[in-house]
C-alpha cells in the first residue's frame, strides 16, 4: 500500500502546461466518519472533471428517508443490505469518485466488489481528528450512545485493520480539503490502470 503523502507530486509539465488525466476506474473513498470522504472526494472529482457520488445520499434518495431514520426504523442489518445494493449499482456506472459510509468497507462482499470494479482509497485519521469533526453532529446514528467518544474509539480500533486492506491510503489530518485531494490524486497517479495521464 502506498501512502499518498509519500508519492511524488505530479500536476504540471516543466513547460508549465497542465497534465491532463483520465480516470479509468471508480475511486471509492473509504474510512471512518469524519475522515473527510465527502469533502475530499468532491474536491477530487472536480479536479478530475468526473461525477461525485455519495453512497449514503443515494441510499437516502432510494429510501426517501435519512440514514438515521433507516437505522431507527429498520435497523443496521437492513441498512447494510441496502448499502451493498446501492454500492453494486454505482460501481457498474461510469468512472467517478464515490464516497462511502464508514461501515461500507467492513463487508467482505463490498470489499470484493470495490477491488474488482474500482480502487479503494483510505482516508486515514486519528481519534482526536475524527472526534473534533463529528462531536457536534447529530446525524451519526452509531454515536448515539452514553459515551460517543469511547464508541468512536472502539469503532476506530475495530475498523482500522480492515481499512488497511484498501488499495491506497492517504493521511487525513493537516491541510485543507484541496491539499488532501491533491494527495489522493498523487496516490492515484501511481496506478496507471486507474488514472491515465498524457505525460
Swiss-Prot record:
Keywords assigned by UniProt, alphabetized: Amino-acid biosynthesis, Aromatic amino acid biosynthesis, ATP-binding, Cytoplasm, Kinase, Magnesium, Metal-binding, Nucleotide-binding, Transferase
Known pathway: Metabolic intermediate biosynthesis; chorismate biosynthesis; chorismate from D-erythrose 4-phosphate and phosphoenolpyruvate: step 5/7
A molecular function (GO) term: shikimate kinase activity
Binding, ATP: 34-39, 140
Pfam family of the protein (one): SKI
Function: Catalyzes the specific phosphorylation of the 3-hydroxyl group of shikimic acid using ATP as a cosubstrate.
Subunit details: Monomer.
Name of this protein: Shikimate kinase
Amino acid at each position: 500500500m502506498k501512502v499518498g503523502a509519500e508519492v511524488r507530486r505530479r500536476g504540471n509539465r516543466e513547460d508549465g502546461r497542465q497534465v491532463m488525466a483520465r480516470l479509468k476506474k471508480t475511486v471509492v473513498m473509504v474510512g471512518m466518519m469524519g475522515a473527510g470522504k465527502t469533502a475530499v472526494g468532491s474536491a477530487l472529482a472536480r479536479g478530475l472533471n468526473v461525477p461525485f457520488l455519495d453512497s449514503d445520499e443515494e441510499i437516502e434518495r432510494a429510501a426517501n428517508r435519512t440514514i438515521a431514520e433507516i437505522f431507527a426504523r429498520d435497523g443496521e442489518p437492513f441498512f447494510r443490505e441496502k448499502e451493498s445494493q446501492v454500492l453494486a449499482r454505482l460501481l457498474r456506472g461510469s468512472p467517478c469518485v464515490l464516497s462511502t459510509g464508514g461501515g461500507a468497507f467492513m463487508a467482505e462482499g463490498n470489499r470484493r466488489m470495490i477491488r474488482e470494479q474500482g480502487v479503494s482509497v483510505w482516508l486515514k485519521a486519528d481519534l482526536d481528528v475524527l472526534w473534533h469533526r463529528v462531536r457536534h453532529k447529530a446525524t451519526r446514528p452509531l454515536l448515539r450512545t452514553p459515551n460517543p467518544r469511547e464508541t468512536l474509539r472502539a469503532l476506530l480500533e475495530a475498523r482500522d485493520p480492515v481499512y488497511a486492506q484498501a488499495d491506497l491510503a492517504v493521511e487525513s489530518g493537516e491541510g485543507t480539503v484541496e491539499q488532501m485531494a491533491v494527495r489522493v490524486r498523487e496516490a492515484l497517479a501511481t496506478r496507471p490502470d486507474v488514472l491515465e495521464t498524457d505525460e
